[in-house]
Amino acid sequence: MAAPVNNPDHGFCRDCLTFQRSETRRCERCGSPRLARHPELYRLHLAHIDCDAFYAAIEKRDNPALKDKPLIIGGGKRGVVSTACYIARIRGVRSAMPMFKALEACPEAVVIPPNMEKYVRVGREVRAMMQTLTPLVEPLSIDEAFLDFAGTERLHGQPPAVVLARFALAVEKEIGITVSAGLSYCKFLAKIASDFRKPRGFSVIGEAEAVGFLATKPVTMIWGVGKAFNATLERDGIRTIGQLQTMERGDLMRRYGVMGDRLYRLSRGEDVRRVDPDQDAKSVSAETTFDTDIASLDELVSVLRGLSEKVSARLKKSGIAGRTVVLKLKTQDFKLRTRNRQLGDPTRLADRIFQAGVELLRKETDGTKFRLLGIGVSDLSDDDKADPPDLVDVQSRKRAMAEGAIDALRDKFGRKAVETGYTFGRGRDAHPPEPLED
């Protein structure tokens, strides 16, 4: 590539990566309109990368017949949308939307149940490519991460902006999906930038423009401002970030506590958090939505066992364990219940997760009908100290040994090769876990 012209307003082409020598609308070399230009383009080094409609993009990659069709990843009329391709989104389909509403908005959509094993595998391929660019990669989920390119220009021989654009092209060519990237000076604004112009987006928010850019945006753009807190701010007459910019830190903290300090800082584009490559997931869980609401403890216990095994499998695959078991229930009128129990030591065993879940579940089965059941673990750590041998509880030790034998058989012959008495014959009235993906 030609040596860069010292004028970031000219920018470079995102398709052929050629630096531009004038402010043309199309690339001087290949004619592409996808030009990256910004006064701070070559000074910024903090990026957020987000795969575009990740689950749906993988399914379309693997089945070209789906390319021009609206696609929803989800399952069952009583479930929710995990994600939807951009064609379906144009028709009004959104993540977390109930499936029946999604199909009302887009009745011609193709619906595919989520295949998490495949998505995790592709996510790891993308992550591995990120880690060749910089050691400072902080995953947020299987399809997005922060990257800090500070100090890498000598390594790559190019400014971070160009490395980022080259990465996007490489993912598209080598993995067959697209990504959108945001480049800024802090995490908060890099994340916002990556949401612009999806799919295949590349957006830049510089430090000089940050306050003015944020002023007109709704307060919901600030992390932590959800529906409930937004309602509180609206009652106080605060709707835009610009209104927050006129307020004193002390006033905001008196009104909203610790959150007031966040409102003050982020409204001014102040975010000093560093990219942390050691940032870990905070929990591992699985849940399912029933076709028919269930009140029976026996039926719920049967489903709980299968979910516990899914959580256990993910923990073992990741080499981690959790100390707190969390039960999640949603009633037929959509009220959410969460209960938790802390264990004496971390676990990755399905049996221990299941037993703790059953104890929590018994206290909730009072005739109430449930439409959703979930189980998970939090307080995660490496699994080297998980599940020490219980010399007192012989049965517990035997169950752990049996679980190890079952795992070995499933690794060799597949997950359905061995079923427990709890899970045998299940699956006719429940959908698999449906994790959400933006």
From Swiss-Prot:
CDD domains: PolY_Pol_IV_kappa. Gene3D superfamilies: 3.30.70.270, 3.40.1170.60, 5' to 3' exonuclease, C-terminal subdomain (1.10.150.20), DNA polymerase, Y-family, little finger domain (3.30.1490.100). The keyword Cytoplasm applies. It catalyses: DNA(n) + a 2'-deoxyribonucleoside 5'-triphosphate = DNA(n+1) + diphosphate. Keywords: Cytoplasm, DNA damage, DNA repair, DNA replication, DNA-binding, DNA-directed DNA polymerase, Magnesium, Metal-binding, Mutator protein, Nucleotidyltransferase, Transferase. GO terms for cellular component: cytosol. Its main location: cytoplasm. Binds 2 magnesium ions per subunit. Its cofactor is Mg(2+). Mg(2+) binds at D50, D143. Its EC number is 2.7.7.7. One of its GO terms (biological process) is error-prone translesion synthesis. The record marks Y55 as: Substrate discrimination. It is found in: Cytoplasm. It is an enzyme of class 2 (transferase). Residues 46-226 form the UmuC domain. The active site is at E144. GO terms for molecular function: damaged DNA binding; DNA-directed DNA polymerase activity; magnesium ion binding. PANTHER family: DNA POLYMERASE KAPPA, DNA REPAIR POLYMERASE UMUC / TRANSFERASE FAMILY MEMBER. Poorly processive, error-prone DNA polymerase involved in untargeted mutagenesis. Copies undamaged DNA at stalled replication forks, which arise in vivo from mismatched or misaligned primer ends. These misaligned primers can be extended by PolIV. Exhibits no 3'-5' exonuclease (proofreading) activity. May be involved in translesional synthesis, in conjunction with the beta clamp from PolIII. Monomer. This is DNA polymerase IV 1. The gene is dinB1.
